[in-house]
From Swiss-Prot:
This is Mannose-1-phosphate guanyltransferase beta-A. Its EC number is 2.7.7.13. It comes from Xenopus laevis (African clawed frog). InterPro entries: GMPPB_C, GMPPB_N, Hexapep_transf_CS, Mannose-1P_guanyltransferase, NTP_transferase_dom, Nucleotide-diphossugar_trans. Coiled coil: none annotated. GO terms for molecular function: GTP binding; mannose-1-phosphate guanylyltransferase (GTP) activity. PANTHER family: SUGAR-1-PHOSPHATE GUANYL TRANSFERASE.
Length: 360
């Protein structure tokens, strides 16, 4: 089977991290976002992954060529010369997608969830129509476009954009499986699959919804990235508790790379990921944070709901909170307070940031 992953966006909502790497290569729980998706696809029997690329495509190509060998699959690049929306990339990759007549997966690159790829194949083959959308239940459907479908069969009746009165609490999760016939509906131009292709398919009875059972999060912005991290760690707790770090000073779900060094008298967790080569000095307190490869947290620093980008340094007695995000190679001097700061790569912070703002 094949899968097309839409990785062409600029990732502006996840800046400053996406100023250093394209969004699919940002580390999520110690592994690039894209790799979580690709490994789940491979596990479900996918042998050919096509990446619809544009922004920083060289970096993506280099990283994924290394993974291609490790995973024993074929990875192809489909280069967009102009942004093609969410449907145009399917037309661009048409030749690759129609090398055989099997159905194929399509994924948005921001999605982290309990990927239900095997179930999707079974469900899609059972109804035998052109398309299947995975839907997920949300608390506040008014913020999204919702999907209205027959609960028994899953046949989609209509879509309602940001409803003000309750019609459904199921939304499009950004995971699809299509039969090749769907490609006859899509032209090679900027096109929205959600607004231009899906409504026509639903009207013709060719589109079905399958409900996701596990967790789901669109991690395209820092606040949601951290929420998604908490959900992912809880899922790890249920499925692979042996991956999590335990011992004195560790609280709840904590993922620590084996190459990280942790000092004495630290309090780490709940919901923390610590990447490769990270050094955490004595007396550090971390909760609900991700600390990326090669960073250093100096003694007695205190971090909550923050993201520390690659190779950054947080000084002694620093306090960081409220979705503070440090880009790559940021230095925060000793004894400062950062509240909701968004710090661009290669900056040195020498004064406190008491109110949320971007540090250029």
């Amino acid at each position: 089977m094949k899968a097309l992953i839409l990785v062409g966006g600029y990732g502006t909502r996840l800046r400053p991290l996406t100023l250093s790497v394209p969004k699919p290569l940002v580390d999520f729980c110690n592994k690039p976002i894209l790799l979580h998706q690709v490994e789940a696809l491979v596990k479900a029997g996918v042998t050919h992954v096509i990446l619809a690329v544009s922004y920083m495509s060289d970096m993506l190509e280099k990283e994924m060529k290394e993974q291609e060998k490790r995973l024993g699959i074929r990875i192809s690049m489909s280069h967009e010369k102009e942004p093609l929306g969410t449907a145009g990339p399917l037309a661009l990759a048409r030749e690759l997608l129609t090398e055989n007549s099997e159905p194929f997966f399509v994924l948005n690159s921001d999605v982290i969830c309990d990927f239900p790829f095997e179930d999707m194949v079974r469900f899609h083959k059972h109804h035998g129509k052109e398309g299947t959308i995975v839907v997920t239940k949300v608390e506040e459907p008014s913020k999204y476009g919702v999907v209205v479908y027959e609960t028994e069969s899953g046949q989609i009746q209509r879509f309602v954009e940001k409803p003000q009165v309750f019609v459904s609490n199921k939304i499009n999760s950004g995971l699809y499986i299509f039969s090749p016939a769907v490609l006859d509906r899509i032209q090679l131009r900027p096109t929205s699959i959600e607004k231009e292709i899906f409504p026509a398919m639903a009207q013709e009875g060719q589109l079905y919804a399958m409900e996701l059972q596990g967790f789901w999060m669109d991690i395209g912005q820092p606040k949601d990235f951290l929420t998604g991290m908490c959900m992912y760690l809880q899922s790890v707790r249920q499925k692979h508790p042996e991956w999590l770090h335990a011992g004195p000073g560790f609280i709840g779900n904590v993922l620590v790379d084996p190459t990280a060094k942790i000092g004495q008298n630290c309090s780490i967790g709940p919901n923390v990921t610590i990447g490769p080569g990270v050094t955490v000095e004595d007396g550090v307190r971390i909760k609900r944070c991700t600390v990326m490869k090669g960073s250093r947290l100096h003694s007695h620093s205190w971090l909550e709901s923050s993201i520390v980008g690659w190779s950054s340094s947080v000084g002694q007695w620093v306090r960081m909170e409220n979705v503070t995000v440090l880009g790559e190679d940021v230095i925060v001097n000793d004894e400062l307070y950062l509240n909701g700061a968004n710090v661009l790569p290669h900056k040195c912070i020498s004064e406190s940031v008491p109110e949320p703002r971007i540090i250029m």
